[in-house]
Amino acid sequence: MSELDVVSRLREVIHLLFRHCKENFAFHRLLGESELIDRVTLGYYESIARYYRSFIRQEAQLGNLRPLDPNMVAYGLIGICYFNSLDWGTAGKKLSSDQIVDLIIDLTLNGIIGSKPWRKPTGWEINSLPEPQPLNAKNGEPVTKGEKTRQAIFNAAEKILGQNGVNRANIGEITREAGVAQGTFYIHFDSKIDLVEGFVKYTNHLLRQELQRYVSRTQDRREAERVGMLAFYKFLSRHRKIYRVVPEFEMIGREVGLWYYKKLAAGYAKGLEQGKERKEIRKLPVTFLVRSLMGLTHFIGLKWIIWVNTPQAGVSSQVFEDIMDFIFQGLKPTKE
């Protein structure tokens, strides 16, 4: 590819990654099985990331791309391509593969930041979170005995399902962990699959609630992106086992797994559309933006939090700063 210019070379490698994700969708779903996470999944994605790290590093050394963390960019691109290759089952006009690749190149080079000046408050720091909105009574702690029992079962399910996987976990282990009788379990759930489906929806609610508590404190969509991503990684660090359950459940009940992401995407799209109208975000297709940003955030969370077997797992300040730089400004070198 040495005879091509940098944009053409970037097109070649992104088209290769997007096509690979699209043509190997079933294999990517198989990698969601929790039993395979340490043994196969890490090595598989690392082998892909190694190629893209090398490409990004080489282009940065030539002055063709900005020298951001190549590992972050590599996993971010994997996430962007993977989420845009999924069949989300939504109606309406769909973009062609070539159109999606063109948009990924545009996003990679130019970022999402719009033309409106971003006025950051005094004392603003890229790694800081505002105080979250307090929970109201409706969204706070469970108040009835039945609600408390159901939440205890969900809390136990997070631990047991996360440790053993959906297939190997059994109801007896979950009820013992929750401190309830098996008969009580069947008052609330028809089966283990019914529990897992309920747990996926419960987790989705918790995450959306957490993000809203922080994002509602912001006035600018770019600030909302920054705060939302920080809040997501904070949530993920507290609930690492969740991301071993949701992908695995896609193998059993794809509709619920897809619902999990579509529910998150629906609210996200509204905020990005408003940001576009205020010129805080560039005029890129909202559906593409949602899938790209969700994919990038998802895979970086996997790489730095879920796939790290230490209590200190997390996205470092420097990596997060480079994520924001990549999302907002892209990799195209700035003119002096």
For each predicted feature, which ranges?
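Amphipathic alpha-helical segments used for helix-helix packing
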Residues: 8-9, 15-39, 53-54, 86, ...
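Amphipathic alpha-helical packing segments from all-alpha helical-bundle domains
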Residues: 12, 19-20, 37-62, 71-75, ...
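Generic hydrophobic, amphipathic alpha-helix propensity
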Residues: 1, 52, 149-157, 174, ...
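Helix-turn-helix
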Residues: 152, 159-194, 198
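Hydrophobic alpha-helical connector segments
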Residues: 1-23, 77, 198, 212-238, ...
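C-terminal peripheral helix-coil segments that are non-catalytic and often amphipathic
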Residues: 19, 50-61, 80, 90-155, ...
